[in-house]
Amino acid sequence: MKLFGTSGIRMKNLDPLIAYKVGFAISKNFKKAVIGRDTRTTGNLIESAITAGLLNGGCDVTTIGMVPTPVLGYSAKDYDLGIMITASHNPPEYNGIKLFNKNGTAFDPKQEKELENIINNDDFNECTWDNIGCVVEDKTAVKKYFEYILQNLNLNTNFNVVVDCANAAGCVVSPNIFTEAGCKVISVNSHCDGRFVGRMPEPNETNLKETVDIIKGLNSNGRNYVGIAHDGDADRMIAIDELGRVTDFDKLLAAFCKYLVQKTGADKIVTTVDASMAIEEYLNEFGAKVIRTKIGDVAVAEELEKTGAIFGGEPSGTWIHRDIHLTPDGILSGLRVLEMMEFYGKKLHEIIDEVPSYCNMREKISCPDNLKQNVMDYVSKEGEKIFEKKPETLDGVRFSFENGWILIRPSGTESYVRVRVEAKEKDFAEKLMKTGISMVKTGISGK
């Protein structure tokens, strides 16, 4: 049975028996674990089940309660591994399990496959009564993270900030840490509720409409509030500018990369194959190299360690700040957006509007999982003929041009093939998208 997707285990109505087996499998090679959970109603159930499996295999467990993923990832340094019970941006009926190494990086596919093999082969090591693991509670994890982040923050301006936590794990840290950093904070959806009663946890324009309206209302009197919104476990963030615009993920990432290079003199940053070409164009004048890697925080973190780059970010709002820790951190990212504003002495909308605007298109085509590889093989060969270019196959199939690019990639969690296009001209973007969709559909039908 395949359990792990592109970001740990995520399932609708996650079976606690699966969680128990995951815990039991972990205990074979790890003997000291820390566990946290987000606000989902099934969080206690899944945490209890995975804890039972860990204990049965002789692994000691420290529980830190309801916390954001960045807190769990930071805490993992004191244990053999960290376990986060979360389904991130998915709806409330979902839950999941994400595993972290001591250094804060998420488990890579090889590590996850090893656990799957233990589970599928029933290769467990059950302990005798006198070797069962024990459970302790640590109520200081949030405080330790809080203090560590503030010690490494360089913010002297008292910004006005609306913080939207989606009734999720960010509630226990984000409003307070922005306040402690000197901001005047208005909290939205800031009480913990695993039903996500205020909005769904995906921080997109549709779900953030009420928060946008609040910011527009506040700023009608010239108050200059910006917004920081999180997903379900606060490993991501998106900003809302003073005009009430949910910032484009790609443009925010490009602006932040430029800021880091200008401020620190960094000679390289890491991003993924689906990020905007505006990043290269923005950083070329500073001689900084853009290193592209596979989609996902695991690949980004691995590349950061390999290259020594100080920052890696995805256009999903998943950013890793290597100088602080290797866990994606939406809380720290939000604070550092404010540092960027202070550095330039500009409003957020002014910074974002300086980033080049290109035509971006995204489509997804239904595709049975068993046909995905055939489709990608066809797209690679056919695309090479059509575009008269060698495909880039780091993650999916990508063709790059002087004025744009197309990426065709199978979803790792759903029965879709995704087509992403970016171009400087709308006509070229539409042409690329039409060609991409046609290739995928032909690859599926075989005709």
UniProtKB/Swiss-Prot annotation:
Recorded E.C. number(s)?
Answer: 5.4.2.10
Active site (UniProt): 88
Post-translational modification here is noted as:
Activated by phosphorylation. Glucose-1,6-bisphosphate or fructose-1,6-bisphosphate can activate the enzyme in vitro. However, since glucose-1,6-bisphosphate is not believed to form in methanogens, the physiologically relevant activator might be a serine kinase protein.
PROSITE patterns registered for this protein in UniProt: PGM_PMM (PS00710)
Provide the catalytic activity annotation.
Answer: alpha-D-glucosamine 1-phosphate = D-glucosamine 6-phosphate
Is the keyword RNA-binding assigned to this protein? no
CDD domains in alphabetical order:
PGM_like1
Q: Which Pfam families match?
A: PGM_PMM_I (PF02878), PGM_PMM_II (PF02879), PGM_PMM_III (PF02880), PGM_PMM_IV (PF00408)
Per its UniProt record, the required cofactor names are: Mg(2+)
In terms of superkingdom, the source organism counts as: Archaea
Q: Which residues cross the membrane?
A: none
Please share the entry's free-text remark on the cofactor.
Binds 1 Mg(2+) ion per subunit.
Q: Where does Mg(2+) bind?
A: 88, 231, 233, 235
Give the UniProt record's GO annotations in the biological process aspect. carbohydrate metabolic process
Please name the GO terms that the record assigns under molecular function.
magnesium ion binding; phosphoglucosamine mutase activity
* Subunit note: Monomer. Also forms large aggregates.
**Record's NCBIfam families?**
Arch_GlmM (TIGR03990)
Query: This chain belongs to which protein, by name?
Result: Phosphoglucosamine mutase
Which organism's genome codes for this protein?
Methanococcus maripaludis (strain DSM 14266 / JCM 13030 / NBRC 101832 / S2 / LL)
Q: What is the lineage of its organism?
A: Archaea, Methanobacteriati, Methanobacteriota, Methanomada group, Methanococci
